[in-house]
Amino acid sequence: MPINDQFPSGLRILVVDDDTSCLFILEKMLLRLMYQVTICSQADVALTILRERKDSFDLVLSDVHMPGMNGYNLLQQVGLLEMDLPVIMMSVDGRTTTVMTGINHGACDYLIKPIRPEELKNIWQHVVRRKCVMKKELRSSQALEDNKNSGSLETVVVSVSECSEESLMKCRNKKKKKKRSVDRDDNEDDLLLDPGNSKKSRVVWSIELHQQFVNAVNKLGIDKAVPKRILELMNVPGLSRENVASHLQKFRLYLKRLSGEASQSNDSESTKRYENIQALVSSGQLHPQTLAALFGQPIDNHHSASFGVWIPNDNLGRSQNEHFSVDVSSASNRPVSVAVHGLSSSANFRQRGDVNNNRIRQGYGSNVNEESWILERSSRQR
């Protein structure tokens, strides 16, 4: 949806909730705000709608606890399909652990029922925020492409104001075409030859198989993990070295993308991302060695360690940098609290500088040990 004088009127929202009463109430409140609303009572049906109408929605508002496919699974599928859609979770469950799980899975916000109209009035901010991220990615890709064609080392800066909606869509389609091409090459590597049949069988990376892979990488260390040793530790019949090599490459690119998002964001966004990473470490979902490789810092397996990241501070014209320090321990299991709508709490993170703990309004954390990273290979057969 283009941002014009009428924005946010006409914002296209998909609402998913198995509670029909709550669903109709939300629809009425959103219609009063001049939003275009599509309602759905089942998460799997909502996923089908998103696949068939990829460019028909600007935002998804989903309940957490639903029969069949829950809100977390829907959130993961939206991320795997690379729809670039902000997803807001909502639930009557306001426990810190539940909220943190939603944020770690990639939710940009978490609303606690009953939801007030004031909270729905400003959800358009997440759409604007996501478009700004897309513009930054487009600016970076255009600069790299221009440098490659000209052979010059000069950095080409493209003004954000010059990035029109049409150019954004072209860049988006170009990225999807490249991804499909890479996926086809990877699928060819993942096929196993059957001597008795001319057809090839496909290796599907299920949640359990991916978890074995992650455990093997954590045991070896992300820097020392090679396909041959990972294959020996996994000991899965029918799995080849080429399959593991392809999956390891995707896993490293995923960690690199997390590191890149954290280094390119501003102070507030960086603080939120490192809070999410701290939550993953505290809950045991992210291995310390993997985290160390992500930021290029060594970590002792037998002692608590800390890593520091310099975050540029451009606010208020200050030229100094602020240092953000997070404690990491493989045996740590300290609770992490998050401020959300209607819920007061304090953040248990040790920070240096003037970084404030604001309410988490946007989450970029991902659970590397769970199904949030697993590629849905079956969707590419369509």
Swiss-Prot record:
Q: Which residues form the Response regulatory domain?
A: 12-128
Q: Which chain positions lie within coiled-coil regions? A: none
Where does motif Nuclear localization signal map? 199-202
**SUPFAM superfamilies the UniProt entry points to:** CheY-like (SSF52172), Homeodomain-like (SSF46689)
The UniProt keywords, alphabetically, are:
Activator, Cytokinin signaling pathway, DNA-binding, Nucleus, Phosphoprotein, Transcription, Transcription regulation, Two-component regulatory system
Residue ranges, compositional bias (Basic residues): 171-181
GO CC, sorted alphabetically, is: nucleus
GO terms, biological process: cytokinin-activated signaling pathway
Q: In which tissues is it expressed?
A: Predominantly expressed in young leaf tissue.
Region of interest: Disordered: 171-193
> Where is the chain membrane-spanning?
none
GO MF annotation list: DNA binding; DNA-binding transcription factor activity; identical protein binding; phosphorelay response regulator activity
Task: Point out the DNA-binding stretch(es).
Answer: 202-252
Localization: Nucleus
Q: How is it modified after translation?
A: Two-component system major event consists of a His-to-Asp phosphorelay between a sensor histidine kinase (HK) and a response regulator (RR). In plants, the His-to-Asp phosphorelay involves an additional intermediate named Histidine-containing phosphotransfer protein (HPt). This multistep phosphorelay consists of a His-Asp-His-Asp sequential transfer of a phosphate group between first a His and an Asp of the HK protein, followed by the transfer to a conserved His of the HPt protein and finally the transfer to an Asp in the receiver domain of the RR protein.
Q: What is its main location?
A: nucleus
Q: Which residues carry this modification: 4-aspartylphosphate?
A: 63
Q: Which family does it belong to?
A: Belongs to the ARR family. Type-B subfamily.
Q: What does this protein do?
A: Transcriptional activator that binds specifically to the DNA sequence 5'-[AG]GATT-3'. Functions as a response regulator involved in His-to-Asp phosphorelay signal transduction system. Phosphorylation of the Asp residue in the receiver domain activates the ability of the protein to promote the transcription of target genes. Could directly activate some type-A response regulators in response to cytokinins.
- Quaternary context: Binds the target DNA as a monomer.
What PANTHER family does this protein map onto?
Answer: TWO-COMPONENT RESPONSE REGULATOR, TWO-COMPONENT RESPONSE REGULATOR ARR14
Name of the protein this chain belongs to: Two-component response regulator ARR14
